[in-house]
Amino acid sequence: LKKIKNTDDGIITLKNSNDFNILSPEFKFVTNKYLIEIVSRYLNCVPILTNLSLWYSPNDKIFENSSQEYHLDHEDYKQVKGFLFINDIDEQTGPLSIINTLQSNEIQKSINYKMTKKTKRVNDEIIGDLIRKNINIQENVITGKSGDLLLCDTSSCFHYGSRLGTKARYILAFQYITPFGFTVDWNWRNYDKLPFKHLECENNLLLKKVLGIKI
């Protein structure tokens, strides 16, 4: 596979949204009715699929001020990111580490967290200081087998991944946000940057909504 993009945070994109179409097995998986129903219940609306990518993390370098440090994602107030494990992932494979919503809210209040380019990342020293102040913080390291699926609200839960390890990580990553996400224009059906709105999906009303196609 040809490397498309290195984000300078340890994640290399091997495939992006433009490499998938309505017949792709990966596309069919992330738009299947069962999965969309789960995400819809959490977001309280039919979500929009805004990204589908195949990620490769070599886990061989440290990148400062990157997704290797704790952070929240900014695309929406609530969102769901999916991570389908392509290979087995253990603690030496740069696994995703997550802090739950309640504890993440406490961290935000304690450090007056602001989601700007300079302050979005939170290093381990800051988290360690909070723990020493008896603030309850528990890191959940997500490991699993090939084929396992993780769904996470990365706008609400502090997280990091792709830290140094002895093995590489391959993940199919995808993202759902609400029609009113911060990165989507108010008239979201006319938002040209939605990656899948050009696809043909006649007679499938739910799929049209998920892709942002005008109904």
What residues fall within each predicted segment?
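Active-site region of the double-stranded beta-helix
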Residues: 45-48, 72-75, 86-95, 101-103
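Short, conserved beta-strand element in jelly-roll/cupin
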Residues: 75-91, 143-145, 151, 175-179
